[in-house]
Structures are given as structure tokens and as C-alpha cells.
Amino acid sequence: MASTNMASATSRFMLAAGIPSGANGGVSSRVSFLPSNRLGLKLVARAEEPTAAAPAEPAPAADEKPEAAVATKEPAKAKPPPRGPKRGTKVKILRRESYWYNGTGSVVTVDQDPNTRYPVVVRFAKVNYAGVSTNNYALDEIKEVAA
């Protein structure tokens, strides 16, 4: 006695009815059954409005240049100034809960993304209790010092 899995049989079936109906005012609808790895069956239904013909654009006069032919180049936007101290700068740590509070370290890198909360990576000569020698700080938690 052989058993047949109906989900696998119908997953290969695809129905695309593109017949416009008069009741919908010329709106065509499509229904598709596509194979899916998770459920074995996926239903997709779309309704489309008929597209209206775009009005023809008037031809440009003989003495006018088309807009596409005009070579106007937009000036490139200037880059914003870099955030934070430069790489290698010595900084003092102002975060009270930090292991390196009032200590100095050198800047490894600064993330330029404005959404980054702690963009400045600082490396220290001394390791903390966990054996770590770097930490991230916010721009207001560090102060540049003379080397």
C-alpha cells in the first residue's frame, strides 16, 4: 500500500489566472502555489490595476537641447570633519567606573559612524584583572593630553 504526500504533489502545481473579470473593473488577479521548504506550500495572491498609457511628451524644439544632453555636474559634497582624536594620540580616561580611570592610553581607532555609542578604542600599557589592555570609550569620556 503506497501513500502519497498531497503537499508535495500540490507544491509543484502552479495556477496563474490572468483572466480579467468584468466585476472588478478590469482588475486582474493572480494566484500562485509555489514550493516552500518549510511548509511545503506557499500561496501568493496579487491584484493589479490596469496601467494607463503615459501621455506622450512633446518633442523638443530644434534650437533647444534635451535635458539629458546638458552636462551639469553636481559638486561633490564635502566630507564631514573626522570625529574624535587622531590615531596614536595620548588620552586621559574620565569614566569613573573604568579600571583605567585617570590613566592614560593611546587611541587605536575611532569609529566615524554617528550612531556608535563608544567610538574610541584606547589601548593601555597595563592590563586589567581580566587580562585586557583595550577598551571603548565615548567622546566625552576621554581627554587629549600632551605626549
Swiss-Prot record:
Compositional bias annotation for Low complexity: 50-61
Region of interest (Disordered), ranges: 49-91
Compartment(s): Plastid, Chloroplast thylakoid membrane
Signal sequence, renumbered to the chain: none
Biological process per Gene Ontology, one example term: photosynthesis
One GO CC annotation: photosystem I reaction center
Transit peptide: 1-46
Annotated membrane topology: Peripheral membrane protein
Keyword Repressor: no
Key words, A-Z: Chloroplast, Membrane, Photosynthesis, Photosystem I, Plastid, Thylakoid, Transit peptide
Similarity field: Belongs to the PsaE family.
Function (record text): Stabilizes the interaction between PsaC and the PSI core, assists the docking of the ferredoxin to PSI and interacts with ferredoxin-NADP oxidoreductase.
Name of the protein: Photosystem I reaction center subunit IV, chloroplastic
Organism name: Hordeum vulgare (Barley)
